[in-house]
């Protein structure tokens, strides 16, 4: 049996990192993953302040720790301290703009301010990094929109790697897309 996939969950929030209030984004991501993933997985969770260096370091650390997927929550708006996309772009060798485009497209159906969101995605080492908004409802909407592509993207990132992680979804909840020959 293969080892569980390790998924990084990174909450970006000044207030949550100080303990001023409970993190809601990280638990929302964890609950979503538990709902849609059929394959074994474990979480590596972190909370950091809205600081570009802290965010970049956490993404690099999670990638180095073997996370095949790093999902961030928070810090994607236009406010001065919203720097998660910049930190992501700093550490990723390849950007995958389609993820952000799709999330904004879907979110605009719910709220006109989704146009202010700057989510992005990219590849850091052998990790797919995906930025999500901070609100649990928006996290679910965005993950429903992009998660069908995530397992195959993880497969592609791990091309040629011995014993790559394999993310399998619960088809009754979410059908992941993989080409027939994959």
Q: Where are the predicted features?
A:
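Non-catalytic beta/alpha edge segments that cap or flank active sites
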Residues: 1-182
